[in-house]
């Protein structure tokens, strides 16, 4: 006996019956038995693609709106509409064939294709829009069926007494009542199971085919005749017309060539090209039936393109033939005033009646089934959270009965429109939007040039995809600008909602492939030989030992990069030769999650090395790509203090919402547990003074600027969710001391190191978090030059700042007493005294104790490794208890005074 996994053969819901849970890791139902696994039916091209596609495109519009289209649009406009519609769907068919032959399409149909191609945000939003299109289409078919029933069994508009078979009273509320009863029947059948349609589909196709044959041969048998047709409008105002059926007649054909848009007798609204096209296009919305069957076909790469194209060509031929028959045999009045014109002029009217009932009822039921399967797929993917969570529940046989109930309720709302023509425009707009999304998915895959995008169907290009997108969007606005604008606004709102929820998935993100493609292209264009000092910007490599003690520094350097490269580097001590696996690769997700938590724009580069020095050398050489490589190395300061654990201070880490979803497999507890505790008194140091100073020397030898950062743990939190950001207060200052304080009088304020220091301070002052801070530059002078010397020094420096376009307050600092403490030139063999260093430190405290951050000149490191400890001791004394301080040594020109 067939179960819920029996392949459907009608209306685009075929593979939706498959075991969707298998592809998503299990059902989301509560306690329901899992679906029994059965081998998929192996279908050929005819039964697997042609039959479902033909049935999907031969809906109620074929029988009840073909005359409406020809009557209002005329033969020429009608054929133009047909060509435009089939041109649009043909472009989309090419995209469908390409995507579907690049992998099996599972439950969800178009939603599955779009979501797995474009990612969860776009896929989820378009999937919901496509679901709404299916809901509205179901309403169209139900209203069309009721309309067909009323044509046979409805009382005459001018009579209140039943006559023969015409026993059903007519009116708006009666239409809603009858539609609700039909919809209830559809819902009950859908709750029982969808396998009924898998058995009946070929029989339905035979019935529809017999009806079509009777329509085509009727002009050869039925003789010309006249009719009296009465329509009742508001206030029981009745109008009777007397159209005629002429048989094949050249005069009739000539009269029906041009358009004659007039009032629609069912809605009493004026028709136009757009409104008629909207009704006609609903007959072209079943083209995805074959693509949805890819998992059930013997040879999907051959059957989907061949079957879909053959089915579309067949339906196009039938529609053209019917347009020609109606234009040649029925006068305009008959076409405008009777939707059931095929039944009125048929050799045996019940042929058409049976065809209408079979086509519309099966279409309505299968649209409901298709919509419920899309909703079920959305619920299983958990994109919209709790509102759709119940829709994931299934019966023991796998029938998503809750999704059916959801869909029934929404379709019931559409039935209050009361007329097929009223909601046909909405259906068309939603379907066009879905088709545009399919074309966009194929275009994105083609542009991304991913090696794994190798569809066996090759008759497409980015030109066809782009043309399909443009055609769909243009026709949307031609049909109804209001509906189109509203649908796009709804789509954007759904996109923003899903982007805000940031759902993670294993489907892959097409955006990443497109970004990679574009970044690669532009990186190749970024030629380091064309670098110019005018366009210099910081490209920073920040070495991080343990993020627990470095988060404030990471956030600070993020402000310092000025749109340049920012890389967090970390060296894992070890030797790959003696390790069973690389310990670095599993760490990347934790570091990237840390970057997300801090809200910084940084890359992460980790390496395995026997020593920190060798690892830093590796990173300085290989970090970056092309013209984007670090030009500045930032290190934490080397001293004997014990670091503080930032994770215990910032609410983002210590009070984070542990119920929030993980970030690509890394939740907050995992992130906290991954990084080791900070160093304490008993912990051995992985880095010795000689190695630390050697790293500074290596960076200078490699032409990298160097910055040493001290006391940045004193800065308040600046990560996402923090309530305070430093530099926001206009009273905060950035203090710059652009001279080598260890060699008084021997350094110029215009050397490379001083200018680099000024540039970095200016860059920080330009950052959004520090824009309101005041920049102060301290110029140290000796009073021996008297007042005129002081003024000359200040004027000279002010002129330099003017050329560099740096806005800053210049502070003149007399340091005669400090300078006298230097016994001679500061050399490696004769360093400055401890008293001098303490005096300079006191001078800095006196003038910069309230600064938010200080920029100091970093002296050259000693060439001898024996003097490394002495060098670090000097720096320690110089910056002791100052607060956040950056010691900077520049080796590259970074300023320009010319245009």
Swiss-Prot record:
Keyword Membrane: yes
Gene Ontology process terms (BP): cell volume homeostasis; chloride ion homeostasis; chloride transmembrane transport; potassium ion homeostasis
Side Cytoplasmic, residues: 1-42, 100-125, 197-201, 291-306, 372-373, 421, 511-563, 771-899
Gene3D superfamilies in the cross-refs: Amino acid/polyamine transporter I
Residue intervals passing through the bilayer: 43-63, 79-99, 126-146, 176-196, 202-222, 270-290, 307-327, 351-371, 374-394, 400-420, 422-442, 456-476, 488-510, 564-584, 750-770
Residue ranges that the UniProt entry lists as topological domain Extracellular: 64-78, 147-175, 223-269, 328-350, 395-399, 443-455, 477-487, 585-749
Membrane topology of the entry: Multi-pass membrane protein
Any one of the GO CC terms: plasma membrane
Pfam families registered for this protein in UniProt: AA_permease (PF00324), SLC12 (PF03522)
Keywords: Cell membrane, Glycoprotein, Lysosome, Membrane, Transmembrane, Transmembrane helix, Transport
InterPro entries: AA-permease/SLC12A_dom (IPR004841), SLC12_C (IPR018491), SLC12A_fam (IPR004842)
A molecular function GO annotation: potassium:chloride symporter activity
Subcellular location(s) per record: Cell membrane; Lysosome membrane
Superkingdom: Eukaryota
Glycosylation sites: 228, 236, 249
Function: Seems to correspond to a subunit of a multimeric transport system and thus, additional subunits may be required for its function. May play a role in lysosomal ion flux and osmoregulation.
Family: Belongs to the SLC12A transporter family.
Name used for this protein in its record: Solute carrier family 12 member 9
């Amino acid at each position: 006996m067939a179960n819920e996994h029996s392949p459907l053969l009608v209306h685009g819901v075929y593979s939706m019956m498959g075991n969707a849970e298998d592809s998503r890791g299990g059902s989301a139902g509560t306690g329901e038995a899992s679906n029994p696994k059965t081998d998929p039916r192996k279908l050929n091209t005819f039964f697997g693609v042609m039959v479902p596609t033909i049935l999907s495109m031969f809906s109620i519009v074929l029988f009840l709106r073909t005359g409406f289209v020809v009557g209002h649009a005329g033969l020429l406009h009608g054929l133009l509409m047909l060509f435009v519609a089939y041109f649009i769907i043909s472009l989309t068919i090419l995209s469908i064939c390409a995507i579907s032959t690049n992998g099996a399409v599972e439950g969800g149909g178009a939603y599955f294709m779009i979501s797995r191609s474009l990612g969860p945000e776009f896929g989820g939003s378009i999937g919901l829009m496509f679901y709404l299109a299916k809901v509205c289409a179901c309403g169209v078919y139900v209203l069309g069926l009721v309309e067909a029933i009323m044509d046979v069994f409805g009382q005459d508009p001018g009579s209140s007494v039943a006559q023969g078979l015409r026993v059903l009273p007519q009116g708006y509320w009666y239409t809603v009542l009858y539609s609700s009863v039909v919809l209830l029947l559809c819902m009950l059948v859908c709750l029982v199971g969808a396998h009924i349609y898998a058995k009946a589909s070929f029989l339905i196709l035979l019935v529809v085919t017999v009806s079509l044959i009777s329509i085509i041969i009727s002009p050869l048998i039925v003789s010309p005749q006249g009719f009296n047709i009465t329509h009742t409008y508001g206030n029981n105002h009745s109008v009777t017309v007397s159209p005629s059926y002429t048989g094949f007649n050249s005069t009739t054909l000539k009269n029906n060539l041009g358009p004659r848009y007039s009032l629609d007798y069912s809605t009493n609204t004026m028709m136009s090209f757009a409104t008629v096209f909207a009704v006609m296009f609903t007959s072209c919305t079943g083209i995805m039936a074959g693509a949805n069957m890819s998992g059930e076909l013997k040879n999907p790469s051959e059957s989907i393109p061949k079957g879909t194209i053959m089915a579309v060509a067949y339906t196009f031929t039938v529609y053209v033939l019917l347009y020609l028959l109606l234009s040649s045999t029925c006068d305009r009045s008959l076409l405008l005033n009777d939707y059931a014109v095929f039944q009125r002029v048929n050799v045996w009217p019940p042929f058409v009646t049976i065809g209408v009932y079979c086509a519309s009822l099966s279409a309505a039921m299968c649209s409901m089934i298709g919509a419920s399967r899309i909703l079920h797929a959305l619920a299983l993917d958990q994109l919209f959270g709790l509102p759709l969570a119940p829709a994931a529940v299934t019966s023991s046989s796998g029938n998503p009965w809750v999704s059916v109930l959801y869909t029934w309720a929404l379709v019931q709302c559409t039935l209050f429109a009361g007329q097929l023509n009223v909601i046909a425009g909405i259906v068309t707009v939603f379907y066009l939007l879905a088709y545009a999304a399919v074309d966009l998915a194929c275009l994105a895959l083609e542009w991304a040039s991913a090696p794994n995008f190798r569809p066996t169907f090759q008759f497409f290009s980015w030109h066809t995809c782009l043309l399909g997108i443009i055609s769909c969007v243009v026709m949307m606005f031609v049909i109804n600008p209001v509906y189109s604008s509203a649908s796009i606004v709804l789509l954007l709102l759904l996109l923003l909602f899903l982007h805000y929820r940031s759902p993670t998935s294993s489907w892959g993100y097409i955006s990443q492939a497109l970004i990679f493609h574009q970044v690669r292209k532009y990186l190749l264009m970024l030629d380091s030989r064309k670098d110019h000092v005018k366009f210099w910007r910081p490209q920073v490599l920040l070495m991080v030992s343990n993020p627990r003690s470095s988060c404030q520094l990471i956030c600070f350097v993020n402000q310092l990069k000025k749109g340049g490269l920012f890389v967090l580097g970390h060296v894992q001590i070890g030797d790959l030769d003696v390790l069973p696996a690389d310990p670095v690769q599993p760490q990347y997700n934790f570091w990237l999650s840390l970057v997300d938590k801090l809200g910084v724009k940084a890359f992460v580069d980790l390496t395995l090395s026997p020593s920190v020095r060798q690892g830093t050398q590796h990173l300085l050489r290989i970090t970056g790509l092309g013209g984007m490589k670090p030009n500045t190395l930032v290190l934490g300061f080397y001293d004997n203090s014990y670091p503080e654990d930032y994770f215990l201070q910032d609410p983002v880490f210590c009070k984070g919402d542990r119920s929030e979803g993980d970030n690509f497999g890394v939740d907050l507890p995992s992130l906290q547990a991954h990084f080791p505790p900070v160093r304490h008194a008993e912990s051995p140091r992985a880095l010795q003074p000689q190695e630390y100073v050697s790293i500074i020397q290596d960076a200078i030898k490699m032409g990298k600027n160097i910055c040493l950062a001290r006391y940045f743990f004193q800065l308040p939190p600046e990560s996402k969710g923090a309530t305070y950001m430093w530099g926001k207060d206009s009273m905060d200052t950035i203090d710059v001391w652009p001279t080598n304080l260890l060699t008084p009088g021997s350094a110029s304020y215009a050397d490379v190191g001083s200018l680099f220091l000024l540039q970095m301070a200016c860059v920080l002052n330009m950052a959004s978090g520090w824009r309101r801070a005041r920049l102060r530059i301290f110029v140290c002078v000796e009073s021996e030059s008297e007042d005129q010397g002081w003024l000359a020094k200040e004027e000279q420096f002010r002129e330099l700042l003017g050329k560099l376009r740096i806005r800053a307050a210049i502070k003149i600092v007399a340091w005669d007493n400090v300078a006298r403490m230097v016994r001679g030139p500061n050399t490696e063999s004769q360093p400055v005294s401890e008293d001098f260093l303490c005096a300079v430190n006191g001078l800095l405290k006196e003038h910069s104790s309230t600064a938010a951050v200080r920029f100091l000149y970093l002296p050259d490191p000693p060439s001898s490794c024996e003097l490394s400890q002495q060098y670090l001791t000097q720096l320690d004394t110089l910056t002791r208890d100052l607060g956040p301080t950056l010691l900077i040594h520049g080796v590259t020109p970074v300023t320009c005074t010319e245009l």
